[in-house]
């Protein structure tokens, strides 16, 4: 007989495949769903936390562990992991220190690249690989007094000397996506920061993937005093270079009106759509609703 765990896994698989089938066969445009999940330090098989992995100074072993995690995740229907976290963190009071590779930019860069290679391999559409997501772009670990979601004071020199190097290495290693950070950077929130998401990431580094917000980070622009309402939050985030609003429901509710009013250009919308669709093609096999 099948174990309860196996039955549950099959049920999740079947629901996932049915959702994918409907998206591809019954929706207007037939665009497949991209299934993302926090595969942080293993999936079915659990490995040491990222901070512990860094202590090994064995990036080859971390690459192997991420490859196993990718295979296990893909077998369960996951296409995309929200990992690795490469936030340089130097305040032990911050509650997410354990998710990253420590206080050194170079160490974060080396292990971040190893993780990307393990997750993505040579071909992300391989049934044993998943897309990686560098997070949290950028300066999330610099929060004052170890408090989460708060203000950070980062000079341009510190940004480039300390916080940029892991992300630059990760982008050059081929990371498919990035996730914007909750914090602001010297007054400008990470999810509405044109300098980091467009001027650096897209224009300077020529990254051709997309940026996704952290969970509900776009409406958080209101709490940060940066936007008056969700509509303005959508405008600020999208125009700054944030292609995907994760669970904020600002884009789906206000994007059409913003375009109609001329506050968001169709050229920018086309570029964002192209980035997401090309990523889908690289990550999955769009002609197949079933990946398992």
Listing of model-derived features with the role each one plays in the protein:
Residues 6-9, 13-285:
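Glycoside hydrolase catalytic-domain context in secreted enzymes
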């Amino acid at each position: 007989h099948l174990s309860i765990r196996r039955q549950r896994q099959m049920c999740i698989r079947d629901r996932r495949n049915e959702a994918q089938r409907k998206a591809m066969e019954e929706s207007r445009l037939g665009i497949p769903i991209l299934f993302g999940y926090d595969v942080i330090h293993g999936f079915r098989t659990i490995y040491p936390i990222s901070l512990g992995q860094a202590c090994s100074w064995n990036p080859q072993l971390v690459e192997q562990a991420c490859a196993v995690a990718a295979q296990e995740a893909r077998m369960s229907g996951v296409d995309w992991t929200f990992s690795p976290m490469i936030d340089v963190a130097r305040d032990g009071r911050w509650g997410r220190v354990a998710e990253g590779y420590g206080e050194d930019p170079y160490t974060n860069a080396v292990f971040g690249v190893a993780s990307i290679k393990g997750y993505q391999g040579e071909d992300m559409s391989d049934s044993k690989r998943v897309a990686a997501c560098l997070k949290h772009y950028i300066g999330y670990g610099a929060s004052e007094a170890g408090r989460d979601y708060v203000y950070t004071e980062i000079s341009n020199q510190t940004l480039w000397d300390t916080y940029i190097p892991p992300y630059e290495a990760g982008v050059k290693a081929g990371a498919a996506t990035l996730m914007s950070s909750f914090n602001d950077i010297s007054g400008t929130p990470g999810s509405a920061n044109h300098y980091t998401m467009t001027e650096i990431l897209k224009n300077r580094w020529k990254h051709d993937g997309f940026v996704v917000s952290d969970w509900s980070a776009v409406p958080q622009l209101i709490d940060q005093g940066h936007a008056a309402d969700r509509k303005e939050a959508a405008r600020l985030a999208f125009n700054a270079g944030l292609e995907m609003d994760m669970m904020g429901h600002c884009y789906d509710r206000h994007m059409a009106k913003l375009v109609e009013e001329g506050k968001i250009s169709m050229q920018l919308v086309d570029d964002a759509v192209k980035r997401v669709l090309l990523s889908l093609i690289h990550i999955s096999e769009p002609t197949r609703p079933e990946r398992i």
